[in-house]
Amino acid sequence: MDLLTSSLIGIGLSMDCFAVALAIGTSERLPLVRSALVIAASFGIFQAGMTIAGWIAGASLYTEISSYGSWIAFLLLAGIGIKMIYDGIREEHEPTLSGLHAIPVILLSLATSIDAFAAGVSFGVLGSTVLMPALAIGLVCFVVSCAGVFCGMRLEKLLGNRTEIFGGVILILIGIQILTDILPL
C-alpha cells in the first residue's frame, strides 16, 4: 500500500481522534504544547498499535469481537463524557482531564482506535504489509489530534467554564455515533 493511500486512511481514522482531542482541549488547563503533544502521542501510538494488532489478529478474531467493539467505544466515551458534564456543572470545579491523568487519556485512546483495529484486519485479509500504513496512520493521527487540542483550547478561552460541558456532550455524541452510525458528526 502506498504512502498516499495510507495517509488518506489515516485521515479517515483520525476524525474521531480530532473530535475527542477538541473535547479534551476544552477542559485542559495545562500548558498548551505539552498537553497537545501528550494527547496526540497517545492517540497516534494507539492508532498505529491497533492497526498492527488488527493485522496480527486477522479476520477470524475480528468477526468474534466486532459486535462488541462499538459498545466498548460507546461506554468508554459516554462514561468520560458524563463525568465531564458533571464536573462542568458542579460548583467546585476541577476539570476531569486536568493534569493529563493517564487512565482517561488511555481509555480515550483505546476508544478512538477500535476502527484502526478493523483497518488492520482488512490489511491482513488483503495480504498487505502493515508497517508503513500503521506508521502513516499514527503520524496523521498525531498531527490531527494536536490540531484538535489546540482548537479546543482556543474554544475554551472563548466560552469559559462551559466548555467542559460542551466537551462532555461531544464525547457522548461520538459514542452514540459509533454505536448507531446514524448521527452525522
UniProtKB/Swiss-Prot annotation:
N-terminal signal peptide: none
Regions that span the bilayer: 4-24, 36-56, 65-85, 105-125, 130-150, 165-185
Keyword annotations of the record: Cell membrane, Ion transport, Manganese, Membrane, Transmembrane, Transmembrane helix, Transport
One Pfam family from the record: Mntp
Keyword Cytoplasm: no
Record's GO cellular component terms: plasma membrane
InterPro entries reported for this sequence: Mntp/YtaF, Put_MntP
Presence of the UniProt keyword Cell membrane in the record: yes
An MF annotation (GO) of this entry: manganese ion transmembrane transporter activity
Membrane topology: Multi-pass membrane protein
Subcellular location: Cell membrane
Similarity comment text for this entry: Belongs to the MntP (TC 9.B.29) family.
Function, as annotated: Probably functions as a manganese efflux pump.
Protein name: Putative manganese efflux pump MntP
Origin species: Methanoregula boonei (strain DSM 21154 / JCM 14090 / 6A8)
Biological classification of the source: Archaea, Methanobacteriati, Methanobacteriota, Stenosarchaea group, Methanomicrobia
